[in-house]
A protein has these predicted regions:
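Iron-sulfur cluster-binding electron-transfer modules in prokaryotic oxidoreductases
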Residues: 1-204
Length: 204
């Protein structure tokens, strides 16, 4: 089911409620203990905080982000990564909904240190990190494209200061916005999802 929840972004509570209810109904039917949010800041926010208010009750399950789950599995020794580490100079963009609102700051860094031999922080990282420019549904508004590209200038300064060979993030929305802006500025910088990077280095 769609979890990003365009209803919340549009301010339409009925659509928002319907989208959350589908996930809740499926989770209850399966009697799951956890619903794992993917690399999407808005999905995590919609399910974790907005969802119970929209459906009018507390969940019988827990919503966790994929990064929280991966970090937990690593700590429990249930997944292991290869001894060979990624040698590229990488940095991490903190998605606003996941980090600032969700408080998931340490987990992505724990995972990055497991797979990267050259991870470097940007200035003002974590809860102080600068938005990608597409937050609050701005990425869906074509009229805001010029402003979105302009606001990326602040993020570009952060990136230029550390000179990464790859930019890692954990939100599909951030990734799309960052890729568009990087292309607009003619930067040679691949954007990776943290989950896919970890997957590359999982030990069989």
């Amino acid at each position: 089911y769609e979890a990003t929840n365009v209803g919340i972004q549009m301010g339409d509570k009925e659509i928002a409620r319907t989208l959350v209810q589908r996930i809740v109904d499926a989770a209850e039917k399966l009697q799951v203990k956890y619903v794992v949010s993917p690399e999407c800041g808005h999905a995590y926010s919609a399910l974790n905080w907005e969802g119970p208010n929209l459906v009018g009750k507390n969940y019988d399950f827990e919503v966790i982000h994929i990064l929280e789950l991966l970090d937990q599995l690593v700590r429990e020794g249930r997944i292991k990564t290869k001894s060979e580490l990624d040698q590229r100079r990488v940095t991490f963009h903190d998605p606003c909904q996941i980090v600032r609102r969700g408080g998931i700051v340490d987990e992505p860094r724990n995972l990055l240190h497991m797979v990267s031999d050259n991870f470097i922080e940007m200035e003002n990282y974590g809860v102080a990190n600068i938005c990608c420019g597409g937050g609050g549904g701005v990425s869906s508004n074509s009229r805001a494209e010029e402003l979105r590209i302009k606001s990326f200038g602040a993020k570009k300064k952060q990136l230029d200061a550390v000179g990464p060979e790859a930019l890692v993030t954990a939100c599909g929305n951030c990734r799309n916005v960052l890729e568009e802006a990087i292309d607009e500025f003619g930067m040679d910088l691949p954007v990776l999802g943290l989950t896919e990077l970890v997957a590359e280095y999982l030990d069989d």
